[in-house]
Protein backbone atom coordinates (compact mmCIF):
# COMPACT_ATOMS: atom_id res chain seq x y z
CA UNK A 1 0.00 0.00 0.00
CA UNK A 2 2.86 2.40 0.81
CA UNK A 3 4.29 1.88 -2.69
CA UNK A 4 0.89 2.66 -4.27
CA UNK A 5 0.59 5.88 -2.26
CA UNK A 6 4.16 6.77 -3.19
CA UNK A 7 3.40 6.40 -6.91
CA UNK A 8 0.23 8.51 -6.58
CA UNK A 9 2.30 11.27 -4.92
CA UNK A 10 4.79 11.02 -7.81
CA UNK A 11 2.07 11.58 -10.42
CA UNK A 12 0.51 14.50 -8.52
CA UNK A 13 3.84 16.23 -7.94
CA UNK A 14 4.82 15.72 -11.59
CA UNK A 15 1.64 17.50 -12.67
CA UNK A 16 2.33 20.40 -10.31
CA UNK A 17 6.03 20.78 -11.13
CA UNK A 18 5.33 20.62 -14.88
CA UNK A 19 3.41 23.90 -14.59
CA UNK A 20 6.40 25.53 -12.93
CA UNK A 21 8.77 24.10 -15.56
CA UNK A 22 6.51 25.57 -18.25
CA UNK A 23 7.14 29.05 -16.86
CA UNK A 24 10.87 28.40 -16.58
CA UNK A 25 11.24 26.91 -20.07
CA UNK A 26 9.21 29.55 -21.90
CA UNK A 27 10.30 32.61 -19.88
CA UNK A 28 6.79 33.30 -18.65
CA UNK A 29 6.85 36.35 -16.30
CA UNK A 30 6.12 35.45 -12.68
CA UNK A 31 6.22 36.96 -9.19
CA UNK A 32 9.48 35.19 -8.34
CA UNK A 33 11.34 37.03 -11.12
CA UNK A 34 12.20 39.74 -8.60
CA UNK A 35 14.32 37.15 -6.75
CA UNK A 36 15.88 35.24 -9.63
CA UNK A 37 16.35 37.84 -12.39
CA UNK A 38 19.22 39.71 -10.65
CA UNK A 39 21.05 36.42 -10.00
CA UNK A 40 20.67 35.33 -13.62
CA UNK A 41 21.80 38.72 -14.97
CA UNK A 42 24.91 38.54 -12.79
CA UNK A 43 25.73 35.07 -14.16
CA UNK A 44 25.25 36.25 -17.76
CA UNK A 45 27.63 39.15 -17.10
CA UNK A 46 30.23 36.89 -15.48
CA UNK A 47 30.29 34.43 -18.39
CA UNK A 48 29.99 37.24 -20.95
CA UNK A 49 27.07 35.82 -22.89
CA UNK A 50 24.52 37.72 -24.93
CA UNK A 51 20.98 36.39 -24.79
CA UNK A 52 20.61 36.00 -28.54
CA UNK A 53 18.60 33.19 -30.07
CA UNK A 54 20.71 30.41 -31.52
CA UNK A 55 20.25 28.18 -34.53
CA UNK A 56 20.16 24.43 -33.96
CA UNK A 57 23.80 24.01 -35.00
CA UNK A 58 24.94 26.94 -32.85
CA UNK A 59 23.01 25.58 -29.86
CA UNK A 60 24.68 22.18 -30.18
CA UNK A 61 28.10 23.79 -30.73
CA UNK A 62 27.83 25.73 -27.46
CA UNK A 63 26.45 22.66 -25.67
CA UNK A 64 29.50 20.64 -26.74
CA UNK A 65 31.91 23.52 -26.04
CA UNK A 66 30.51 24.06 -22.55
CA UNK A 67 30.70 20.35 -21.76
CA UNK A 68 34.23 20.08 -23.16
CA UNK A 69 35.43 22.97 -21.00
CA UNK A 70 33.87 21.48 -17.86
CA UNK A 71 35.37 18.08 -18.64
CA UNK A 72 38.87 19.47 -19.15
CA UNK A 73 38.89 21.44 -15.89
CA UNK A 74 37.47 18.51 -13.92
CA UNK A 75 40.06 16.12 -15.36
CA UNK A 76 42.91 18.40 -14.25
CA UNK A 77 41.51 18.83 -10.73
CA UNK A 78 41.27 15.06 -10.26
CA UNK A 79 44.93 14.69 -11.28
CA UNK A 80 46.21 17.29 -8.76
CA UNK A 81 43.75 17.01 -5.85
CA UNK A 82 46.32 15.87 -3.26
CA UNK A 83 48.20 19.17 -3.58
CA UNK A 84 45.12 21.35 -3.20
CA UNK A 85 43.20 22.53 -0.14
CA UNK A 86 40.13 20.90 1.47
CA UNK A 87 41.83 17.52 1.66
CA UNK A 88 41.81 16.79 5.41
CA UNK A 89 42.06 13.02 4.85
CA UNK A 90 45.13 13.38 2.59
CA UNK A 91 43.68 11.39 -0.31
CA UNK A 92 46.01 10.95 -3.28
CA UNK A 93 45.62 11.99 -6.92
CA UNK A 94 43.65 9.71 -9.21
CA UNK A 95 45.50 7.84 -11.95
CA UNK A 96 45.13 9.15 -15.49
CA UNK A 97 42.77 6.35 -16.57
CA UNK A 98 40.63 6.67 -13.43
CA UNK A 99 40.52 10.47 -13.71
CA UNK A 100 39.38 10.13 -17.33
CA UNK A 101 36.68 7.67 -16.32
CA UNK A 102 35.49 9.83 -13.41
CA UNK A 103 35.41 12.96 -15.58
CA UNK A 104 33.51 11.23 -18.39
CA UNK A 105 31.16 9.63 -15.90
CA UNK A 106 29.99 12.80 -14.16
CA UNK A 107 30.18 15.00 -17.25
CA UNK A 108 27.68 12.75 -19.01
CA UNK A 109 25.27 12.43 -16.05
CA UNK A 110 26.25 8.74 -15.75
CA UNK A 111 28.07 8.69 -12.41
CA UNK A 112 29.66 5.29 -12.93
CA UNK A 113 32.15 4.95 -10.07
CA UNK A 114 35.34 2.92 -10.34
CA UNK A 115 36.52 4.46 -7.08
CA UNK A 116 35.35 4.85 -3.48
CA UNK A 117 34.70 8.49 -2.68
CA UNK A 118 35.88 8.27 0.92
CA UNK A 119 39.39 7.15 -0.12
CA UNK A 120 39.87 8.51 -3.65
CA UNK A 121 38.47 12.06 -3.58
CA UNK A 122 39.19 15.16 -1.51
CA UNK A 123 36.39 17.38 -0.25
CA UNK A 124 37.40 19.92 -2.91
CA UNK A 125 36.88 17.48 -5.78
CA UNK A 126 33.72 16.09 -4.15
CA UNK A 127 32.27 19.61 -4.28
CA UNK A 128 33.97 21.35 -7.23
CA UNK A 129 34.07 18.37 -9.58
CA UNK A 130 31.45 15.83 -8.53
CA UNK A 131 28.69 18.05 -7.13
CA UNK A 132 29.34 20.80 -9.70
CA UNK A 133 29.05 18.37 -12.61
CA UNK A 134 25.90 16.89 -11.07
CA UNK A 135 24.25 20.30 -11.46
CA UNK A 136 25.62 21.15 -14.91
CA UNK A 137 25.17 17.71 -16.53
CA UNK A 138 21.53 17.60 -15.41
CA UNK A 139 20.99 21.15 -16.66
CA UNK A 140 22.65 20.35 -20.00
CA UNK A 141 20.34 17.39 -20.58
CA UNK A 142 17.33 19.51 -19.65
CA UNK A 143 18.45 22.34 -21.95
CA UNK A 144 18.76 20.24 -25.10
CA UNK A 145 15.42 18.57 -24.32
CA UNK A 146 13.67 21.93 -23.97
CA UNK A 147 15.30 23.15 -27.18
CA UNK A 148 13.96 20.04 -28.94
CA UNK A 149 10.46 20.48 -27.49
CA UNK A 150 10.28 24.17 -28.42
CA UNK A 151 10.76 23.40 -32.09
CA UNK A 152 8.78 20.16 -32.11
CA UNK A 153 5.70 21.72 -30.52
CA UNK A 154 5.91 24.91 -32.56
CA UNK A 155 5.78 27.04 -29.40
CA UNK A 156 8.47 29.33 -30.81
CA UNK A 157 10.23 29.83 -34.13
CA UNK A 158 13.62 29.68 -32.41
CA UNK A 159 15.44 26.97 -30.51
CA UNK A 160 16.50 29.28 -27.68
CA UNK A 161 19.79 30.20 -26.03
CA UNK A 162 21.79 27.39 -24.43
CA UNK A 163 23.32 29.50 -21.66
CA UNK A 164 19.99 31.03 -20.72
CA UNK A 165 18.34 27.61 -20.57
CA UNK A 166 20.91 26.01 -18.27
CA UNK A 167 21.17 29.12 -16.08
CA UNK A 168 17.42 29.39 -15.55
CA UNK A 169 17.12 25.67 -14.80
CA UNK A 170 19.96 25.66 -12.27
CA UNK A 171 18.93 28.91 -10.56
CA UNK A 172 15.15 28.43 -10.57
CA UNK A 173 14.81 24.64 -10.25
CA UNK A 174 17.88 22.68 -9.22
CA UNK A 175 19.30 24.92 -6.49
CA UNK A 176 15.99 25.68 -4.69
CA UNK A 177 14.76 22.08 -4.90
CA UNK A 178 18.17 20.68 -3.88
CA UNK A 179 18.32 23.03 -0.89
CA UNK A 180 14.96 21.77 0.39
CA UNK A 181 16.00 18.13 -0.08
CA UNK A 182 19.38 18.75 1.61
CA UNK A 183 17.75 20.26 4.68
CA UNK A 184 15.36 17.31 4.90
CA UNK A 185 18.22 14.80 4.64
CA UNK A 186 20.17 16.66 7.34
CA UNK A 187 17.10 16.41 9.57
CA UNK A 188 17.14 12.64 8.99
CA UNK A 189 20.81 12.30 9.93
CA UNK A 190 22.85 12.85 6.75
CA UNK A 191 26.12 14.69 7.62
CA UNK A 192 27.11 18.07 6.15
CA UNK A 193 30.56 19.05 7.39
CA UNK A 194 34.07 19.91 6.20
CA UNK A 195 35.74 18.14 9.12
CA UNK A 196 38.03 15.20 8.42
CA UNK A 197 37.17 11.56 9.02
CA UNK A 198 36.19 10.69 12.58
CA UNK A 199 38.41 8.17 14.38
CA UNK A 200 36.68 6.38 17.26
CA UNK A 201 37.47 3.53 19.61
CA UNK A 202 34.96 0.69 19.54
CA UNK A 203 33.75 -1.27 22.57
CA UNK A 204 36.29 -3.97 21.74
CA UNK A 205 39.11 -1.41 21.91
CA UNK A 206 39.76 -1.32 18.15
CA UNK A 207 40.13 2.06 16.44
CA UNK A 208 37.71 2.65 13.56
CA UNK A 209 37.64 5.42 10.96
CA UNK A 210 34.21 6.79 10.10
CA UNK A 211 34.10 8.65 6.79
CA UNK A 212 31.85 11.66 6.48
CA UNK A 213 31.90 15.12 4.93
CA UNK A 214 29.69 17.43 2.82
CA UNK A 215 27.24 14.63 2.03
CA UNK A 216 23.77 16.19 2.22
CA UNK A 217 24.54 18.79 -0.47
CA UNK A 218 25.74 16.04 -2.80
CA UNK A 219 22.93 13.62 -1.97
CA UNK A 220 20.19 16.08 -2.91
CA UNK A 221 21.42 16.89 -6.43
CA UNK A 222 22.59 13.29 -6.87
CA UNK A 223 18.96 12.20 -6.95
CA UNK A 224 17.23 15.35 -8.17
CA UNK A 225 19.52 15.54 -11.21
CA UNK A 226 19.28 11.77 -11.90
CA UNK A 227 23.03 11.55 -11.31
CA UNK A 228 23.56 8.67 -8.88
CA UNK A 229 27.19 8.85 -7.78
CA UNK A 230 27.61 8.38 -4.04
CA UNK A 231 29.82 10.29 -1.62
CA UNK A 232 30.72 6.87 -0.20
CA UNK A 233 31.51 3.72 -2.12
CA UNK A 234 28.44 1.88 -0.85
CA UNK A 235 26.22 4.74 -2.01
CA UNK A 236 22.67 5.07 -0.61
CA UNK A 237 22.82 1.73 1.17
CA UNK A 238 24.90 3.45 3.89
CA UNK A 239 23.20 4.96 6.98
CA UNK A 240 24.88 8.32 6.32
CA UNK A 241 23.71 8.77 2.73
CA UNK A 242 20.28 7.24 3.32
CA UNK A 243 19.58 7.12 7.07
CA UNK A 244 15.88 6.32 7.37
CA UNK A 245 12.75 4.91 5.82
CA UNK A 246 11.65 8.48 5.02
CA UNK A 247 14.95 9.53 3.49
CA UNK A 248 14.67 6.49 1.22
CA UNK A 249 11.29 7.65 -0.07
CA UNK A 250 12.56 11.24 -0.43
CA UNK A 251 15.55 10.13 -2.49
CA UNK A 252 13.40 7.86 -4.67
CA UNK A 253 10.86 10.62 -5.30
CA UNK A 254 13.65 13.10 -6.09
CA UNK A 255 14.86 10.82 -8.89
CA UNK A 256 11.42 10.63 -10.46
CA UNK A 257 10.26 14.22 -10.13
CA UNK A 258 11.80 16.07 -13.07
CA UNK A 259 11.73 13.27 -15.71
CA UNK A 260 8.04 12.67 -14.91
CA UNK A 261 7.31 16.41 -15.00
CA UNK A 262 8.98 16.82 -18.39
CA UNK A 263 6.46 14.47 -20.03
CA UNK A 264 3.59 16.61 -18.76
CA UNK A 265 5.54 19.74 -19.74
CA UNK A 266 5.60 18.38 -23.30
CA UNK A 267 1.82 18.10 -23.12
CA UNK A 268 1.44 21.67 -21.85
CA UNK A 269 3.69 22.94 -24.65
CA UNK A 270 1.48 21.13 -27.16
CA UNK A 271 -1.61 22.82 -25.69
CA UNK A 272 -1.58 25.43 -22.89
CA UNK A 273 -0.01 25.93 -19.48
CA UNK A 274 -3.25 24.87 -17.78
CA UNK A 275 -4.05 21.96 -20.10
CA UNK A 276 -2.10 18.86 -21.09
CA UNK A 277 -2.36 17.47 -24.62
CA UNK A 278 -3.72 13.87 -24.67
CA UNK A 279 -0.71 12.72 -26.70
CA UNK A 280 1.67 13.48 -23.82
CA UNK A 281 -0.67 11.73 -21.39
CA UNK A 282 -0.57 8.62 -23.59
CA UNK A 283 3.24 8.73 -23.60
CA UNK A 284 3.20 9.00 -19.80
CA UNK A 285 0.76 6.07 -19.61
CA UNK A 286 3.05 3.93 -21.78
CA UNK A 287 6.06 4.77 -19.61
CA UNK A 288 4.16 4.21 -16.37
CA UNK A 289 2.68 0.87 -17.46
CA UNK A 290 6.14 -0.42 -18.41
CA UNK A 291 7.55 0.87 -15.13
CA UNK A 292 4.84 -0.95 -13.12
CA UNK A 293 5.41 -4.14 -15.12
CA UNK A 294 9.14 -4.14 -14.38
CA UNK A 295 8.56 -3.21 -10.73
CA UNK A 296 6.16 -6.14 -10.23
CA UNK A 297 8.62 -8.48 -11.96
CA UNK A 298 11.50 -7.40 -9.72
CA UNK A 299 9.34 -7.69 -6.60
CA UNK A 300 8.16 -11.17 -7.60
CA UNK A 301 11.59 -12.68 -8.20
CA UNK A 302 13.17 -11.03 -5.14
CA UNK A 303 10.40 -12.24 -2.84
CA UNK A 304 10.58 -15.68 -4.50
CA UNK A 305 14.19 -15.98 -3.36
CA UNK A 306 16.87 -18.47 -4.35
CA UNK A 307 15.66 -22.00 -5.27
CA UNK A 308 19.05 -23.48 -4.33
CA UNK A 309 18.60 -22.24 -0.75
CA UNK A 310 15.00 -23.46 -0.72
CA UNK A 311 16.21 -26.99 -1.50
CA UNK A 312 18.43 -26.70 1.57
CA UNK A 313 15.42 -25.89 3.72
CA UNK A 314 16.14 -22.14 3.95
CA UNK A 315 12.87 -20.41 3.13
CA UNK A 316 12.19 -16.73 2.44
CA UNK A 317 13.00 -14.08 -0.12
CA UNK A 318 16.38 -12.86 -1.31
CA UNK A 319 17.85 -10.65 1.44
CA UNK A 320 21.45 -10.95 0.24
CA UNK A 321 22.98 -7.51 -0.34
CA UNK A 322 20.02 -5.66 1.16
CA UNK A 323 19.65 -3.40 4.17
CA UNK A 324 17.29 -4.78 6.82
CA UNK A 325 15.85 -1.29 7.38
CA UNK A 326 14.56 -1.30 3.79
CA UNK A 327 13.83 -4.97 3.22
CA UNK A 328 13.00 -6.59 -0.10
CA UNK A 329 10.08 -4.33 -1.05
CA UNK A 330 11.79 -0.94 -0.79
CA UNK A 331 15.01 -2.36 -2.23
CA UNK A 332 13.19 -3.64 -5.34
CA UNK A 333 11.34 -0.32 -5.66
CA UNK A 334 14.59 1.65 -5.44
CA UNK A 335 16.28 -0.69 -7.92
CA UNK A 336 13.50 -0.25 -10.48
CA UNK A 337 13.37 3.53 -10.04
CA UNK A 338 17.13 4.07 -10.23
CA UNK A 339 17.37 2.22 -13.56
CA UNK A 340 14.08 3.36 -15.11
CA UNK A 341 15.03 6.98 -14.42
CA UNK A 342 18.71 6.21 -15.22
CA UNK A 343 20.03 7.61 -11.95
CA UNK A 344 22.31 4.77 -10.86
CA UNK A 345 22.20 5.32 -7.11
CA UNK A 346 21.67 2.11 -5.13
CA UNK A 347 20.30 1.21 -1.70
CA UNK A 348 21.16 -2.47 -2.20
CA UNK A 349 23.76 -4.41 -4.15
CA UNK A 350 22.49 -5.17 -7.65
CA UNK A 351 25.09 -7.91 -8.05
CA UNK A 352 23.26 -9.82 -5.30
CA UNK A 353 19.84 -9.70 -6.96
CA UNK A 354 18.33 -12.95 -8.22
CA UNK A 355 19.13 -13.59 -11.90
CA UNK A 356 15.76 -12.42 -13.25
CA UNK A 357 15.43 -9.79 -10.53
CA UNK A 358 18.78 -8.44 -11.74
CA UNK A 359 17.63 -8.63 -15.34
CA UNK A 360 14.95 -6.01 -14.60
CA UNK A 361 17.39 -3.10 -14.09
CA UNK A 362 19.46 -4.37 -17.01
CA UNK A 363 16.49 -4.40 -19.40
CA UNK A 364 15.28 -0.99 -18.19
CA UNK A 365 18.68 0.44 -19.12
CA UNK A 366 18.60 -1.34 -22.46
CA UNK A 367 15.24 0.29 -23.23
CA UNK A 368 16.62 3.63 -21.98
CA UNK A 369 13.23 5.32 -22.41
CA UNK A 370 11.02 4.39 -19.45
CA UNK A 371 11.09 7.99 -18.19
CA UNK A 372 14.88 8.01 -18.42
CA UNK A 373 17.28 10.68 -17.21
CA UNK A 374 17.01 14.45 -17.04
CA UNK A 375 15.77 15.54 -20.47
CA UNK A 376 17.41 12.80 -22.52
CA UNK A 377 14.90 10.18 -21.35
CA UNK A 378 12.02 12.01 -23.00
CA UNK A 379 14.15 12.63 -26.09
CA UNK A 380 14.81 8.89 -26.39
CA UNK A 381 11.12 8.10 -25.95
CA UNK A 382 10.21 10.54 -28.74
CA UNK A 383 12.50 8.57 -31.05
CA UNK A 384 10.50 5.43 -30.22
CA UNK A 385 7.28 7.41 -30.79
CA UNK A 386 8.43 8.51 -34.26
CA UNK A 387 9.48 4.95 -35.11
CA UNK A 388 6.09 3.66 -33.99
CA UNK A 389 4.21 6.29 -36.01
CA UNK A 390 6.34 5.57 -39.08
CA UNK A 391 5.83 1.79 -38.96
CA UNK A 392 2.10 2.05 -38.18
CA UNK A 393 1.59 4.53 -41.02
CA UNK A 394 3.24 2.21 -43.53
CA UNK A 395 1.18 -0.73 -42.25
CA UNK A 396 -2.08 1.08 -43.07
CA UNK A 397 -0.81 2.72 -46.26
CA UNK A 398 -0.64 6.31 -44.98
CA UNK A 399 2.06 8.96 -45.28
CA UNK A 400 4.09 8.88 -42.04
CA UNK A 401 3.77 12.14 -40.11
CA UNK A 402 4.19 13.33 -36.55
CA UNK A 403 2.47 16.44 -35.17
CA UNK A 404 1.68 17.54 -38.70
CA UNK A 405 5.26 17.09 -39.97
CA UNK A 406 6.08 14.42 -42.55
CA UNK A 407 8.65 11.80 -41.57
CA UNK A 408 10.64 11.08 -44.73
CA UNK A 409 13.83 9.31 -45.73
CA UNK A 410 16.28 11.79 -44.22
CA UNK A 411 14.56 11.76 -40.84
CA UNK A 412 14.30 7.96 -40.79
CA UNK A 413 18.03 7.59 -41.45
CA UNK A 414 18.78 9.87 -38.51
CA UNK A 415 16.18 8.11 -36.33
CA UNK A 416 17.68 4.71 -37.19
CA UNK A 417 21.19 5.95 -36.37
CA UNK A 418 20.00 7.42 -33.09
CA UNK A 419 18.34 4.13 -32.15
CA UNK A 420 21.33 1.97 -33.13
CA UNK A 421 24.00 3.88 -31.18
CA UNK A 422 22.90 2.45 -27.82
CA UNK A 423 22.83 -1.29 -28.67
CA UNK A 424 25.96 -1.08 -30.82
CA UNK A 425 28.00 0.43 -28.00
CA UNK A 426 26.75 -2.17 -25.52
CA UNK A 427 27.27 -5.21 -27.73
CA UNK A 428 30.56 -4.21 -29.39
CA UNK A 429 32.31 -3.23 -26.15
CA UNK A 430 30.92 -6.27 -24.30
CA UNK A 431 32.44 -8.46 -26.99
CA UNK A 432 35.75 -6.59 -26.69
CA UNK A 433 35.82 -7.33 -22.95
CA UNK A 434 36.03 -11.04 -23.75
CA UNK A 435 38.53 -10.58 -26.59
CA UNK A 436 41.09 -8.11 -25.19
CA UNK A 437 43.78 -10.00 -23.23
CA UNK A 438 43.45 -9.49 -19.48
CA UNK A 439 40.12 -7.64 -19.61
CA UNK A 440 38.12 -10.62 -18.40
CA UNK A 441 40.42 -10.96 -15.37
CA UNK A 442 38.16 -8.38 -13.71
CA UNK A 443 35.32 -10.91 -13.60
CA UNK A 444 34.73 -12.42 -10.17
CA UNK A 445 32.06 -14.88 -11.27
CA UNK A 446 32.31 -17.69 -13.83
CA UNK A 447 29.73 -18.80 -16.37
CA UNK A 448 26.48 -16.89 -16.88
CA UNK A 449 26.86 -14.34 -14.08
CA UNK A 450 30.21 -13.25 -15.46
CA UNK A 451 28.52 -12.44 -18.77
CA UNK A 452 25.86 -10.52 -16.82
CA UNK A 453 28.55 -8.46 -15.08
CA UNK A 454 30.10 -7.40 -18.38
CA UNK A 455 26.75 -6.77 -20.06
CA UNK A 456 25.49 -4.75 -17.08
CA UNK A 457 28.64 -2.58 -16.95
CA UNK A 458 28.45 -1.49 -20.57
CA UNK A 459 24.66 -1.21 -20.54
CA UNK A 460 24.90 1.07 -17.52
CA UNK A 461 27.63 3.12 -19.21
CA UNK A 462 25.71 3.49 -22.46
CA UNK A 463 22.42 4.31 -20.73
CA UNK A 464 24.13 7.06 -18.70
CA UNK A 465 23.00 5.21 -15.58
CA UNK A 466 26.09 4.42 -13.53
CA UNK A 467 24.95 1.53 -11.33
CA UNK A 468 26.90 -1.69 -11.55
CA UNK A 469 27.25 -5.33 -10.66
CA UNK A 470 30.01 -4.35 -8.27
CA UNK A 471 31.58 -7.78 -8.11
CA UNK A 472 33.40 -6.62 -11.24
CA UNK A 473 36.96 -5.45 -10.50
CA UNK A 474 36.63 -2.47 -12.80
CA UNK A 475 39.39 -0.05 -11.73
CA UNK A 476 41.81 -1.13 -14.47
CA UNK A 477 43.06 0.69 -17.54
CA UNK A 478 40.83 -1.31 -19.90
CA UNK A 479 37.62 -0.86 -17.94
CA UNK A 480 38.31 2.80 -17.12
CA UNK A 481 39.05 3.77 -20.72
CA UNK A 482 36.46 1.57 -22.44
CA UNK A 483 33.54 2.59 -20.23
CA UNK A 484 34.69 6.22 -20.41
CA UNK A 485 34.55 6.12 -24.21
CA UNK A 486 31.13 4.44 -24.15
CA UNK A 487 29.74 7.08 -21.78
CA UNK A 488 30.93 9.97 -23.95
CA UNK A 489 29.73 8.47 -27.24
CA UNK A 490 26.38 7.37 -25.79
CA UNK A 491 25.72 10.83 -24.39
CA UNK A 492 26.67 13.13 -27.24
CA UNK A 493 26.01 11.24 -30.49
CA UNK A 494 22.26 10.65 -29.81
CA UNK A 495 21.74 14.24 -28.60
CA UNK A 496 23.29 15.68 -31.76
CA UNK A 497 21.28 13.30 -33.96
CA UNK A 498 18.02 14.07 -32.13
CA UNK A 499 18.46 17.82 -32.53
CA UNK A 500 19.18 17.25 -36.24
CA UNK A 501 16.00 15.17 -36.54
CA UNK A 502 13.84 17.92 -35.06
CA UNK A 503 15.59 20.62 -37.10
CA UNK A 504 14.86 18.62 -40.24
CA UNK A 505 11.21 18.07 -39.30
CA UNK A 506 10.43 21.69 -38.47
CA UNK A 507 11.91 22.90 -41.75
CA UNK A 508 9.08 21.12 -43.53
CA UNK A 509 5.70 22.66 -44.15
CA UNK A 510 3.22 21.52 -41.53
CA UNK A 511 -0.25 20.44 -42.53
CA UNK A 512 -3.53 19.92 -40.74
CA UNK A 513 -3.74 16.40 -39.34
CA UNK A 514 -6.52 14.25 -40.78
CA UNK A 515 -8.63 11.53 -39.23
CA UNK A 516 -6.88 9.05 -41.53
CA UNK A 517 -3.52 9.71 -39.83
CA UNK A 518 -2.27 7.30 -37.17
CA UNK A 519 -4.10 8.33 -33.95
CA UNK A 520 -1.63 9.27 -31.22
CA UNK A 521 -4.05 10.48 -28.54
CA UNK A 522 -5.60 7.24 -27.28
CA UNK A 523 -4.76 4.14 -25.26
CA UNK A 524 -4.41 2.08 -28.43
CA UNK A 525 -1.38 4.18 -29.35
CA UNK A 526 0.09 3.65 -25.87
CA UNK A 527 -0.37 -0.10 -26.27
CA UNK A 528 1.24 -0.18 -29.71
CA UNK A 529 4.11 2.00 -28.45
CA UNK A 530 4.80 -0.43 -25.59
CA UNK A 531 4.71 -3.41 -27.97
CA UNK A 532 7.14 -1.78 -30.42
CA UNK A 533 9.57 -0.80 -27.65
CA UNK A 534 9.59 -4.32 -26.20
CA UNK A 535 9.87 -5.97 -29.64
CA UNK A 536 12.67 -3.72 -30.89
CA UNK A 537 14.71 -4.13 -27.72
CA UNK A 538 13.87 -7.81 -27.39
CA UNK A 539 15.11 -8.62 -30.88
CA UNK A 540 18.27 -6.63 -30.18
CA UNK A 541 19.27 -7.93 -26.76
CA UNK A 542 17.53 -11.31 -26.20
CA UNK A 543 20.50 -13.45 -27.37
CA UNK A 544 22.78 -11.68 -24.88
CA UNK A 545 20.26 -11.98 -22.06
CA UNK A 546 20.09 -15.73 -22.76
CA UNK A 547 23.85 -15.93 -22.16
CA UNK A 548 23.52 -13.93 -18.95
CA UNK A 549 20.59 -13.69 -16.50
CA UNK A 550 18.20 -16.07 -18.28
CA UNK A 551 20.86 -18.77 -18.51
CA UNK A 552 21.74 -18.24 -14.85
CA UNK A 553 18.08 -18.59 -13.81
CA UNK A 554 17.78 -21.86 -15.74
CA UNK A 555 20.97 -23.09 -14.08
CA UNK A 556 19.47 -22.47 -10.62
CA UNK A 557 16.58 -24.79 -11.46
CA UNK A 558 18.75 -27.45 -13.10
UniProtKB/Swiss-Prot annotation:
It is found in: Cell membrane; Membrane raft. It holds the Pfam family KdpA. It comes from the Bacteria. The keyword Thylakoid does not apply. GO terms for molecular function: P-type potassium transmembrane transporter activity; potassium ion binding. GO terms for cellular component: membrane raft; plasma membrane. Coiled coil: none annotated. The keyword Nuclease does not apply. It is a multi-pass membrane protein. InterPro entries: KdpA (IPR004623). The chain crosses the membrane at residues 1-21, 60-80, 129-149, 169-189, 246-266, 281-301, 326-346, 353-373, 376-396, 415-435, 485-505, 523-543. Keywords: Cell membrane, Ion transport, Membrane, Potassium, Potassium transport, Transmembrane, Transmembrane helix, Transport. PANTHER family: POTASSIUM-TRANSPORTING ATPASE A CHAIN (PTHR30607), POTASSIUM-TRANSPORTING ATPASE POTASSIUM-BINDING SUBUNIT (PTHR30607:SF2). The system is composed of three essential subunits: KdpA, KdpB and KdpC. Belongs to the KdpA family. Part of the high-affinity ATP-driven potassium transport (or Kdp) system, which catalyzes the hydrolysis of ATP coupled with the electrogenic transport of potassium into the cytoplasm. This subunit binds the extracellular potassium ions and delivers the ions to the membrane domain of KdpB through an intramembrane tunnel. This is Potassium-transporting ATPase potassium-binding subunit 2. It comes from Staphylococcus aureus (strain N315).
